[in-house]
Amino acid sequence: MTQVCIAAYVYGVVQGVGFRYNTQHQATALGLSGYARNLDDGSVEVLACGEQPQVDKLVEWLKNGGPRSARVDRVLVEPRGAADFQGFSIRY
């Protein structure tokens, strides 16, 4: 299968609630690489690379609200060029 990369911008109550940590856990379980980081506007950027079905599962998890402590209002997803990440990290 072909590797794909996406950037997802997650809006709502997603900072200070363990969102990046839980996203890292979910992405790692799906075998994805990339990162999650807080943005200045209160959203979280998730860049994920891997097999299309696994990336789709992460996007579905994000759209379904992520961790229970978060409240996701909307998720914008954009395709990205291939990138070579080692694992899935939290960026600061």
UniProtKB/Swiss-Prot annotation:
SUPFAM superfamilies in the record: Acylphosphatase/BLUF domain-like
Keyword Hydrolase: yes
Molecular function GO terms recorded: acylphosphatase activity
Originating gene: acyP
Family designation: Belongs to the acylphosphatase family.
EC top class, as a word: hydrolase
Keyword field: Hydrolase
Source species, domain of life: Bacteria
Protein source organism: Serratia proteamaculans (strain 568)
Catalytic site positions: 20, 38
Chaperone among keywords: no
Protein name in UniProt: Acylphosphatase
InterPro entries in the record: Acylphosphatase (IPR020456), Acylphosphatase-like_dom (IPR001792), Acylphosphatase-like_dom_sf (IPR036046), Acylphosphatase_bac (IPR028627), Acylphosphatase_CS (IPR017968)
Signal peptide feature range: none
